[in-house]
């Protein structure tokens, strides 16, 4: 089993505050002979007459010494998880959970902006102190 990131419970509580129901912790996906454990699976009913929205969230702390190395590893993991979900659960959307301080410091750089645009990285920006989701970025 993969080690839980430092802010795993923080993001879980933040999602629950926004009325998400955690369905899987972790969300286990097996496809093409590969097994993955994505940090969280969640869903939320949008309205009684509409289908529920389903997401998967990969939580990152980005507390390492090299921001670009941390991002590089997270991006590779995200792309593999997204492919696995497209094949096994196409109705579930993957989001990368990023602490607000790292987002403000790293994702304002031109390279980071070009990368998330090119690879269409959906991001969930969270505040680990207040335990809230600050922003959803598609």
Sequence positions of predicted segments:
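Active-site metal-binding core of divalent-cation-utilizing nuclease and nuclease-like domains
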Residues: 21-56, 70, 134
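Nuclease catalytic cores
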Residues: 3-8, 12
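Mg2+/Mn2+-dependent nuclease catalytic core
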Residues: 55, 60-80, 84-85
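Nucleic-acid nuclease catalytic cores
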Residues: 83-116, 126-128
